[in-house]
Amino acid sequence: MGKLSFLLKEPVEYIVERPVIEEALPHRDPFLFVDEVHLFGEQRYMMGLRRFTGREAFFRGHFPNYPVVPGVMILECMAQAVGAAIMQNPKLKGKEAFFMSIDYAKFRKQVRPGDLLKIAIEVLRSGKITKIYAEAYTHNGLCTEAELNFIIVD
């Protein structure tokens, strides 16, 4: 388990559902990869959820006989979950968060059709440049971890 695994059992203070996520993000189907965001009291920790149904187009080619969620799609899920979560902060009203860079990413386990991806998020530094640490979990445990950077613009 990763350092943010405690969030998997943490009581959720507020759930952000799809209509509010769509207000926070410019993404739309078929490229919206966050179903729900969970907020925990303080603005430091958050969680994004995404269920992979197996009907996503990328499974047809990655891989036809053994479908696996591509690692870049897991990173995109992380980025979208972060964007949707941090934009719930009232201090950021009227601003936008843009995914800027990946400091590192490590892929530990596969994510398969039917898996519920739980993305645990920690804000390491907030401001114009916001630094995030994220861990993605499925029922099999920690599958991906990454440090991501975002720029907040007016």
Question: Which ranges hold each PLM region?
Answer:
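Terminal leader/tail segments of proteins
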Residues: 28, 36-38, 44-47, 59, ...
